[in-house]
Swiss-Prot record:
This is Putative 4-hydroxy-4-methyl-2-oxoglutarate aldolase. InterPro entries: RraA (IPR010203), RraA/RraA-like (IPR005493), RraA/RraA-like_sf (IPR036704). The lineage of its organism: Bacteria, Pseudomonadati, Pseudomonadota, Gammaproteobacteria, Chromatiales. A divalent metal cation binds at residue 102. GO terms for molecular function: 4-hydroxy-4-methyl-2-oxoglutarate aldolase activity; metal ion binding; oxaloacetate decarboxylase activity; ribonuclease inhibitor activity. One of its GO terms (biological process) is regulation of RNA metabolic process. Belongs to the class II aldolase/RraA-like family.
Length: 164
């Protein structure tokens, strides 16, 4: 069972060692798994999802892919095929600072997805992007190795794994 973001905020908001950060409420849940979390792998790119496919093709070990897509609203960075690939490879979900597509299909896949919005247009395929770099969006800076927890009430990030 996934930890609830509200419970994590209540338990850890005043603990300096957890470095708990709550994202600004701008992301929308699209995946069939509303509650998800795990260790973060970051990716920074713009309107190009080749690196998203590369990472979701590798074993995820219950992790969360955090994609800083620059907030682009001009194309989608993830759709049903990539979500299914991530699920098959053991990722718990993805946070996309950009758009997704195939929203009806995403809702049927046991994979967490939160993003800014939907867009029907696919992304470019140039293979550009940086992995394991600090990314900042929604009022929070996230690094690979942080822990992310998402549910219907929002997204929180901590410097370490949290328990209740």
């Amino acid at each position: 069972m996934a930890l609830l973001t509200t419970d994590l905020c209540d338990a850890y908001a005043d603990e300096p060692g957890a470095q708990l950060r709550a994202m600004n409420p701008m992301l929308i849940g699209y995946g069939g798994r509303a509650r998800f979390g795990g260790p973060v792998t970051t990716l920074k790119l713009f309107e190009d999802n080749v690196r998203v496919r590369e990472l979701l093709s590798a074993p995820g070990d219950g992790g969360v892919l955090v994609v800083d897509g620059g907030g682009s609203m001009r194309c989608a960075l993830l759709g049903d095929r990539l979500a299914e690939l991530g699920r098959e490879n053991g990722w718990s979900g993805a946070i996309i600072y950009g758009c997704v597509r195939d929203s009806a299909e995403l809702a049927q896949i046991d994979f967490g997805v939160q993003a800014l919005n939907t867009h029907p247009l696919k992304s470019q395929k140039k293979g550009l992007g940086e992995r394991d770099v600090s990314v900042t969006f929604a009022g929070v800076t996230i690094q690979s190795g942080d822990w992310l927890y998402a549910d219907e009430d929002g997204v929180v990030v901590a410097s370490r794994e949290l328990t209740l």
